[in-house]
Curated annotation (Swiss-Prot):
Subunit structure: Homodimer.
Record-listed E.C. numbers: 2.3.3.13
Lineage, opening ranks: Bacteria, Pseudomonadati, Pseudomonadota, Alphaproteobacteria, Hyphomicrobiales
GO cellular component: cytosol
Gene Ontology biological process terms from the UniProt entry: L-leucine biosynthetic process
Annotated catalysed reactions: 3-methyl-2-oxobutanoate + acetyl-CoA + H2O = (2S)-2-isopropylmalate + CoA + H(+)
Main location per the UniProt record: cytoplasm
The protein's annotated pathway: Amino-acid biosynthesis; L-leucine biosynthesis; L-leucine from 3-methyl-2-oxobutanoate: step 1/4
Name of protein: 2-isopropylmalate synthase
Gene name of the record: leuA
Length: 519
């Protein structure tokens, strides 16, 4: 994201704390291997600093930080430490083998924390800052000091703390909105005042770290930069304590998109953001909300007819960034009751249909009626609306019978009889489990190149006699089809769903073949 017109004074350092603050989110614990995967990803996408963990918290955390420090090629690797000598020693040991290591130490500064948590006086805390920052600086050249709960700390005392930390050797000063209490103008002003009043402020980089308790984490982070901060601490997907942290993807795209009013830049490659979101979501088992900015499923999806019409004519009518800029292939037009005729026609063309005006209008009327009754409209639903012969085409493959031999030892075996274009074929196959055997039998009887993307089983009702509803998604030539089938026998339902998906692929190929030949 660098530009010849920008300078280092306008550069914003991106400090990712997904592996430390993000993992403190209840339920978001990652395995050692998952931490290494996330760290490698962050290192390659242009993140400047990776806070890899809290080394003294556990043996596992120490080992993860140490391993990440050894492996990182680009990013500074930071280890967190309380203002306790043993913590600082442990953090120093963890980042010792990093190409560029950092110790990040912190202490509370607000009256409520000093009185009720630390039970220390203001002078006591100033002494702690001097001693612990100096200790850290003796171990590494890069030391970050944080004033915990800085936004509820009186400005005069906060200035004294910052001056003390810099004098002791801190190279970065982080002023976190620990409890998500600040509002943007207040936070911007705090940085401006401190940088003006602290005599040695020019010897350190100032940093923001904002929590989202009031939904202002990203706004506050950007306000802090306007006040003179040049490091933003954030996490992928905004995960973190309580309501979370500033989301890295939102911070990066705000800087990239609004350069007209925020003349800053950062090193993160924006096309990696969607993949990063998915990797962290999978590692933490925390799903990304559908309407999440930048990386949510609906971030580039449009259902309103007015919006769909505008996007089809010119994407910039309703999109302030391109989906490709964040690693999404294309804008998604979600077909539903709000969709207009233009978007419906566009979807039909994607599916290989070119209808006359009267046919299009008739299909559109039936589509709107279906959308009023059905929550989710799939491509297959639309195909069924406009193809009167679709049902017969889907019956080209039909399950006649299925026998599966399963046991506790050895491979499972499936014997299947399928009707293909009116002719019965029979064959058998083995697999690692009965479902695998069934699907292998289908492949033997009906050779194809489709890949299985999804296999799900749900009980339709309660009880041991419940029907099983099986969903199968197959992909071929970069396009996917989904089919469902229900049966009291899960294996029969699985076979029917798989065959139904193949029928849809065959139907699509037949429909598009004349178009391909004509082109």
């Amino acid at each position: 994201m660098t530009s010849p017109s920008t300078s280092d004074k306008d550069r914003v350092v991106i400090f990712d704390t997904t592996l430390r603050d993000g993992e403190q989110c209840p339920g978001a614990t990652m395995t050692h291997e998952e931490k290494l995967e996330v760290a490698e990803m962050l290192d390659t996408m242009g993140v400047d600093i990776i806070e890899a963990g809290f080394p003294i918290a556990s043996v596992g955390d120490f080992e993860a930080v140490a391993e990440i420090a050894k492996r990182a090629n680009n990013a500074v690797i930071a280890g967190l430490a309380r203002a306790i000598p043993a913590d600082i020693v442990r953090a120093g040991e963890a980042v010792r083998h990093a190409k560029r290591g950092r110790i990040h130490t912190f202490v509370s500064t607000s009256p409520i924390h000093l009185a009720h948590q630390m039970r220390k006086s203001e002078e006591d805390v100033l002494g702690i800052i001097t001693a612990t920052v100096a200790q850290a600086r003796n171990l590494v050249d890069d030391v970050e000091w944080s004033a915990m709960d800085s936004t509820r700390t009186p400005i005069d005392y906060l200035c004294r703390c910052v001056e003390t930390a810099i004098a002791a050797g801190a190279t970065t000063i982080n002023l976190p909105d620990t409890v998500g209490y600040a509002v943007p103008e207040e936070y911007r002003r705090m940085f401006k005042v401190i940088r003006e009043r602290v005599p040695n402020a020019d010897k350190a980089v100032f940093s923001v770290h904002c929590h989202d308790d009031l939904g202002l984490a990203v706004a506050n982070s950007l306000a802090g930069v306007e006040g003179g901060a040049r490091q933003i601490e954030c996490t992928i997907n905004g995960i973190g304590e309580r309501a979370g942290n500033a989301a890295l993807e939102e911070v990066v795209m705000a800087i990239k998109t609004r350069g007209d009013v925020m003349p800053y830049w950062c090193n993160v490659e924006s096309t990696t953001l969607t993949r990063a979101s998915k990797v962290v979501s999978a590692a933490t088992s925390f799903p990304v909300q559908y309407n999440k900015a930048i990386v949510g499923r609906n971030a580039f999806a449009h259902e309103s007819g007015i919006h769909q019409d505008g996007v089809l004519k010119n994407a910039q009518t309703y999109e302030i960034m391109t989906p490709e800029s964040v690693g999404v292939k294309q804008t998604s037009l979600v077909m539903g009751k709000h969709s207009g005729r233009h978007a419906f026609q566009h979807k039909l063309r994607e599916l290989g249909y070119e209808l006359a005006d009267n046919q299009l209008q008739d299909a559109f009327v039936r589509f709107k009626a279906l959308a009023d009754r059905k929550k989710d409209i799939y491509d297959e639903d639309i195909e069924a609306l406009v193809d009167q012969e679709l049902a017969q085409t889907h019956d080209r493959l039909r399950l006649v019978s299925l026998t599966v031999i399963a046991g506790t030892h050895g491979p499972q075996r499936a014997t299947m009889k399928v009707e293909v274009d009116g002719k019965v074929r029979i064959d058998e196959a083995e697999g690692n489990g009965p479902v695998d055997a069934v699907f292998n039998a289908v492949k033997t009887l009906v050779p194809h190149e489709a890949k299985l993307e999804l296999y799900q089983v749900h009980a339709v009702t309660a009880g041991t006699d419940a029907q099983a509803e099986v969903s199968v998604r197959l992909s071929q030539d970069g396009r996917s089809v989904t089919a469902r089938s229900s049966d009291p026998d899960t294996l029969v339902a699985s076979a029917k769903a798989y065959l139904s998906a193949l029928n849809k692929i065959i139907s699509r190929q037949q429909r598009e073949a004349p178009v391909a030949a004509a082109s």
